[in-house]
Amino acid sequence: MEDVLDVYELPYNPQRPVVCMDEKPYQLLGEARSPLPMRPGNDQKVDSEYVRNGTCSIFAFVEPLGGAHHVSVREHRTAIDWAEEIKYLADVMYPDVEKIILVMDNLNTHKPASLYKRYPCSAIIPADEARRIMKRLEIHYTPKHGSWLDIAEIELNVMTRQCLNRRIDNISNLRKELSAWEVERNTVAAKVNWQFRTVLLPQVQKQLLFRNSAQKLTNWKN
């Protein structure tokens, strides 16, 4: 936990941007019946029944101090998908920086091995492509059960409230909606003012220790 908090306390450096990454599944939902249109004095009426149109995955990147944002939609959440997103991060979003300081959770696909799986040595792909991408990164993982430390999780929550508070029935429409949302976020360069600091950690740890001890005592009495 201290490692991630120390990263968040680093001063802004455009040559060493701190970027947070996260992903979430999304359920594509269609209307079982056509909604009744809005009328004067009445909101649009939407039936409670819906049609499941499968799932997809949303990947999000946010630079808290620089205000850069990127979201993408993929049909799956595999090592290949993650590797391609990381290549986009390195080669399109930050092609000229010295190092990208990347914060993310410790998901099984969020590993250097995923890059080597996607970009193996071949006649088409250079032998050192995966290594080249990895050398651009300085990775910091959030601890187990500590995904709340990933600022990209906050970004996904904001995105859900602002853009995904209605049914979207297919990937094409979802991509259009999120693309428009991304443009807006980048236009205003929305930044994140992270307040939780390393100096507050002992107090939080003490509270967690007290809570766990109280829970164990309750379980023992029961």
Task: Kindly give the residue locations of the regions a language model identified.
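Short, basic/hydrophobic alpha-helical segments
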Residues: 80-101
